[in-house]
C-alpha cells in the first residue's frame, strides 16, 4: 500500500491519493547527487501490512502532521510525501525484497530528498548501504540495534559496511538498545529478580537487545540460567516454559516484537504456571501486543521498556503541543512511536528550511550534510543533538506495565 500526500501552503490538512506501481528488483546503480526539483519528495518505508499497522499508521500520521505544520512547503518548493509499505501479506511483517525495492525506487526518483524509515533494524541493514551510495539521507523513527551505527555490537565490519561512501547518511531519533537492554536488566533486579532466562527471536533487533540485557544482567549480579532463540512461527512455547521452570527462572526477557510472537510467549508463561515476571522491549510497546496477549497474560506479569515517555506524558512545551495537535487532527490517542515519526520528519524539514533560508540548493548531499549538523534541536522529545555516528543524544527510557488493557508507566529513566 502506497499513499501519496501533497501539502500546500493553503491547505494545511492532508490530501491522500492511493497510487500503485511495480517495484524494480534490479541492482541499484550509484548515481550523481541530483539537484532538487519542484516539488520535492519525502518518503517513508514502514511495515503497513500486518499487526504493526496500527503503530505505523500512528507514525505516518505524525509525519503528515509535521509536514502540515510547515504549510507543505520549504521556501517556494512544494512537499510531496509518500507512505510506502515494506511488508508483505505472506510474511505479515517487513519483507527484505520489498525494502530493497523501496530503496531502489527512492534512489531512482530524483525528487526524493529524504527517506524516513525503517521500523525494523533488519530492514535498515538492507537499505542503509544502498541509500548511502547516492547521498540519500535516511532518518529512522524506530531502529534501535546499536550495530547499525556503532562498532562492537555486531559483526566486525559493522557499521562501516553500511557507509560505502565513507559518509554518515543514516540518523535516528530513538535511543539504542545498548541503553534499553541495560534498563531492562536493571529493572529485573529492582523488582527482585535473581535468575533470568533470556529469549530472542533470532532477528537483528531481538538478538541485539537480548544480548545487551544478558551482558548487563551478569554485570549487576543476576544469574543467567538460560539463553535461547525461539521459532517465531511456533503455535506454543510450552516446552520452553517447562525448561524455564526447571531452571528456576524468576524473570524472563524476550528480545523480540509483537510480530515475532511475544504475545504467545506471554500467554504460555502464565498458562504454564511459571511464576516469573516477563520483560519485553519497545518492539512490544503497541496496543496490538496487549490485544494479542490479553490482559490475563500481562497485567501483574509483564513489563515493557520503551525509548521515551508515553505520548500523554511528554514534558516539553513542544511535546505537549504534539500530543494535543495529534488528538485534534486524528481524533484519537497516538501510539507510542507516533512522536518519533513526527520528530524524524521535523528534523528533516528543519534542515531543509535552514538550507532554503540560506539560499542553498536543496540537493541530496546538502540535505544529508545539514541534518548531520543537527545540534540542540528543540523538539517534542526535548532538546537533543545527533552525534558523530548519527545517533540521538536523547537517552530517556521508560518502563511500563499493563493495566485495564492499557500501558501505564512505572518509571522513567533519564
Name every feature range the model reports, one short phrase each:
Residues 15-18, 22-414:
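Extracytosolic ligand-binding ectodomains
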Amino acid at each position: 500500500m502506497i499513499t501519496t500526500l501533497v501539502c500546500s501552503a493553503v491547505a494545511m490538512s492532508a490530501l491522500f491519493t492511493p497510487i500503485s506501481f511495480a517495484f524494480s528488483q534490479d541492482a541499484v546503480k550509484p548515481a550523481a547527487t541530483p539537484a532538487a526539483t519542484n516539488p520535492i519528495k519525502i518518503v517513508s518505508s514502514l511495515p503497513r501490512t500486518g499487526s504493526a499497522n496500527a503503530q505505523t499508521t500512528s507514525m505516518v500520521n505524525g509525519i503528515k502532521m509535521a509536514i502540515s505544520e510547515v504549510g507543505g512547503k520549504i521556501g517556494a518548493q512544494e512537499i510531496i510525501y509518500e507512505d510506502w509499505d515494506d511488508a508483505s501479506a505472506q510474511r505479515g511483517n517487513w519483507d527484505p525484497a520489498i525494502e530493497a525495492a523501496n530503496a531502489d525506487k527512492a534512489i531512482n526518483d530524483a525528487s526524493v530528498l529524504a527517506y524516513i524509515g525503517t521500523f525494523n533494524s533488519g530492514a535498515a541493514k538492507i537499505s542503509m548501504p544502498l541509500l548511502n551510495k547516492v547521498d540519500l539521507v535516511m532518518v529512522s523513527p524506530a531502529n534501535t540495534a546499536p550495530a547499525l551505527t556503532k562498532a562492537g555490537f555486531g559483526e566486525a565490519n559493522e557499521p562501516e559496511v553500511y557507509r560505502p561512501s565513507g559518509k554518515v547518511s543514516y540518523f535516528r531519533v530513538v535511543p539504542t538498545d545498548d541503553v534499553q537492554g541495560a534498563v531492562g536488566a536493571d529493572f529485573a533486579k529492582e523488582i527482585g529478580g535473581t535468575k533470568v532466562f533470556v529469549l530472542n527471536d533470532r532477528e537483528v533487533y531481538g538478538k541485539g537487545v537480548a544480548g545487551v540485557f544478558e551482558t548487563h544482567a551478569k554485570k549487576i549480579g543476576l544469574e543467567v540460567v538460560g539463553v535461547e532463540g525461539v521459532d517465531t512461527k511456533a503455535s506454543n512455547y510450552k516446552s520452553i516454559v517447562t525448561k524455564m521452570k526447571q531452571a528456576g527462572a524468576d524473570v524472563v526477557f524476550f528480545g523480540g516484537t509483537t510480530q515475532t510472537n511475544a504475545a504467545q510467549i506471554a500467554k504460555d508463561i502464565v498458562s504454564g504456571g511459571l511464576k516469573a515476571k516477563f520483560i519485553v522491549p519497545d518492539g512490544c510497546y503497541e496496543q496490538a501486543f496487549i490485544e494479542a496477549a490479553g490482559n490475563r497474560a500481562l497485567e501483574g506479569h509483564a513489563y515493557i521498556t520503551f525509548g521515551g515517555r508515553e505520548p500523554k506524558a511528554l514534558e516539553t512545551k513542544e511535546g505537549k503541543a504534539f500530543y494535543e495537535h495529534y488528538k485534534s487532527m486524528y481524533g484519537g490517542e497516538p501510539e507510542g512511536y507516533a512522536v518519533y515519526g513526527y520528530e524524524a520528519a521535523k528534523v528533516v524539514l528543519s534542515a531543509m528550511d535552514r538550507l532554503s533560508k540560506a539560499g542553498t540548493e536543496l540537493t541530496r548531499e546538502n540535505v544529508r550534510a545539514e541534518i548531520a549538523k543537527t545540534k540542540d534541536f528543540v523538539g517534542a522529545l526535548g532538546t537533543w543533538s545527533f552525534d558523530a555516528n548519527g545517533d540521538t543524544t536523547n537517552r530517556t527510557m521508560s518502563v511500563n506495565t499493563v493495566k485495564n488493557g492499557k500501558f501505564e508507566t512505572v518509571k522513567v529513566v533519564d
